[in-house]
Amino acid sequence: MVQLGLSNIMWGLAAGQLLVGPISDRRGRKKPLFWCLVLFAVTTAVAAAATEIHVFLVMRFFEGLGAAGAIVLSRSIAADRYTGRELGSFMGVMRAIQGIALVTAPMLGALIADAAGWRGIFWILFGMGVVLAFITLFVFVETLPRSRINSAQRSSNGTQRESIRESSAKLIADPVFCGIVFQQLLASGILFGHISSSPFIFRGHFDLSPELYGLTFGLLALGITAGAVISSRIDPLKALGVGAVGMLVCAVLVAVCFITNLSLWAVLPFYFLLMAFLGLTLPAAMTAALTLHRQRAGFAAAVIGSVGFVGGGLVAPLTAIGEVTRTASIIFVVCGVLLVLISFWLNRRMKLIRGDELKL
C-alpha cells in the first residue's frame, strides 16, 4: 500500500505541474494556487479517513495534483517577482529549503507516526493545506501583471487550448530550453538513483544501523543544500557547467570506491561532493529556463519540474537490477557523462544565441 501510494502521488506531482503551469500563465497565479491548495487539503483529509485501499490510492493521486500546483506556482511567482541574480538567488534558497526538508521530514514524520499513527501525519498535512489556502486567499497578492493576463486571454482564437499549443510549440522549438530539460532529466536521474539505492548501499552494503543510516542520509542531503546555496551566488550558465563536470568526476570516484570495495569513510566524501554538485545544478536549470521564457514562466516551470519526476520514475526501478553498488555506479557515471556532453553543447549554444539573456 505504501509503495502504491507513493507511486500515485508521484504521478500526480508530474501531471499536476503540466496542467496548472500553463493555466496560470493565462489566469494568473492566485486563483490556481488557492484551488490547488483546496484540492490538496480535501484529498488529504479523505485519504486520512479512508478505510478502503482504492479510495486511499485515488486520493493520493489527486493529493499529488494539488501539491504539484503549489510547486510549479511557487517557481512561476518567483519569475514574476525577480529577474537576473535575484531570481537565481531565490531559486537557490528554495532548493536549500528543500534540502533541509529532506533531512528533517523523515525524522519529524517518524515522531508523529509514533505518537499519532500514519493518519496523524495526514491530518497535520490537511491543517497545513487549510492554513496555506487561507493565506493565499486573504494575504497573497497576484504577481502576474494584469497586462499579461489580458494578453494571454486575447490569443489567436480566444481559447485556452490554442494558447497552450502555441506555448508548447515555442518551448519545443527552443533548442536551449530542450537542452536544459534533458540536463534536468539526467540530474534528477542521479538524485532519484541515490534516493532509491541509498538504503541498500548504506544499510546493506556498509551494514549501518538505522540511526547511522539516517545521519548519513541527512549529511548527503545537506550536501544538496550547500550546493544550492552556492548556486544562488553564481550565474546559471556557470553553475550548469561546473555542476555537470563535478558530478561526472565524483561519480567516477564513487564508482572506483565501490569497485575496489573501499570503506564507507573513503566513499562518503566523494558521495557528499556528488550531492553538492547536484544541488548546484538543479536550481540553475530552473533559473535558466525561467529567464529564457519569462512570458510563459508557468509552462516552462511545469516542464522542468515534471521532467524531474519522469527521471525518477525511469531510474528508480533500475536500482533493483543486479548488485546495488554496481548498478548505482553505472547510473551515476552514465548520467554524468551525458550531463557533461549536453553541458558543453549548451554552454556554447547559450553564449552564441542567448548569452545576454542568461547573464546575471
Region annotations inferred by a language model:
Residues 92-138, 144-145:
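Helix-loop-helix hairpin linking two adjacent transmembrane segments in secondary transporters
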Residues 143-180:
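Juxtamembrane intracellular "pre-TM" segments in multi-pass secondary transporters
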Residues 28, 49-55, 66, 257-261:
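Helix-breaking motifs and short loop linkers at transmembrane-helix boundaries and internal kinks
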Residues 61-100:
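Cytoplasmic helix-loop-helix junction between adjacent transmembrane helices
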Residues 290-324, 332:
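A late C-terminal transmembrane helix in Major Facilitator Superfamily
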Residues 240-282:
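C-terminal transmembrane helical hairpin of 12-TM major facilitator-type secondary transporters
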Residues 39, 43-46, 54-62, 265-270:
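Paired small-residue
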Residues 15-53:
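Conserved MFS/SLC helix-loop-helix module at the cytosolic interface between two early adjacent transmembrane helices
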